[in-house]
């Protein structure tokens, strides 16, 4: 849902790539607006809810101009908070990559693997593409990733949730923000063993 690459952006009518997962969610909200009344629902009282990565999706929907007016309340659970400015400025504190940053990393990884055009990338298959970042990082000693999360692309996502919150441009809806017990607890051993640079 979030793969970026300059050639994917070039073939897009909007000139961007990535954020496909968010576009799918926006399309689901469009469907709800058109059809939910037939099931007894109220298209003027739609609440979006997400936990962990789903909470990250809710944060992106709250920032995206393409989702405006399609929901009326938002619940965000265990999706991180708003980082302080000093952390936002650092690479570790960066909440959202820009499209250009994400495309650069994806292109670097694909080029390294010899997948230098869309035809080769598409022929490689999902499993190969999914494993490339891990293989590339192990072979190169780098920490480059083909993003698995939304990017600031100037179309679907204009700025990070943090920056939108600070500038007051998030969706003007009631929010419930919290956390769940033991979110990502199964990943704790791996996180604890991860060496920070």
Predicted regions and their residues:
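Active-site catalytic pocket residues across diverse enzymes, especially alpha/beta-hydrolases
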Residues: 36, 65-66
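Catalytic nucleophile loop
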Residues: 54-58
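Cap/lid segment of the alpha/beta-hydrolase catalytic domain
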Residues: 1-26, 34-38, 86-90
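Short, hydrophobic alpha-helix immediately C-terminal to the catalytic nucleophile
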Residues: 29, 59-63
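Substrate-access "cap/lid" subdomains that shape
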Residues: 59, 68, 77-78, 82-197
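Alpha/beta-hydrolase fold nucleophile elbow
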Residues: 32, 39-52
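Short secondary-structure junction motifs
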Residues: 41-44, 71, 115-118
């Amino acid at each position: 849902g979030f793969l970026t690459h300059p050639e994917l952006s070039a073939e897009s009518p909007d000139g961007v790539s990535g954020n496909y997962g968010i576009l799918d969610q926006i399309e689901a909200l469009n469907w709800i607006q058109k059809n939910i009344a037939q099931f007894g629902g109220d298209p003027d009282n739609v609440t979006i809810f997400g936990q962990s990565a789903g909470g990250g999706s809710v944060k992106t929907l709250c920032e995206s101009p393409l989702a405006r007016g399609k929901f009326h309340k938002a619940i965000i659970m265990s999706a991180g908070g708003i980082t302080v400015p000093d952390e936002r400025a650092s690479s570790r504190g960066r909440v959202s990559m820009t499209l250009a940053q994400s495309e650069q990393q994806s292109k670097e990884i694909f080029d390294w693997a010899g997948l230098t055009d869309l035809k080769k990338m598409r022929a490689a298959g999902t499993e190969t593409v999914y494993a490339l970042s891990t293989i590339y990082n192990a072979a190169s000693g780098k920490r480059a990733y083909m993003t698995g999360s939304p990017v600031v692309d100037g179309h679907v996502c204009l700025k990070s949730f943090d920056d939108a919150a600070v500038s007051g441009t998030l969706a003007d809806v009631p929010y419930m923000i919290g956390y769940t017990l033991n979110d990502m607890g199964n990943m704790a051993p791996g996180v604890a063993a991860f060496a920070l640079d």
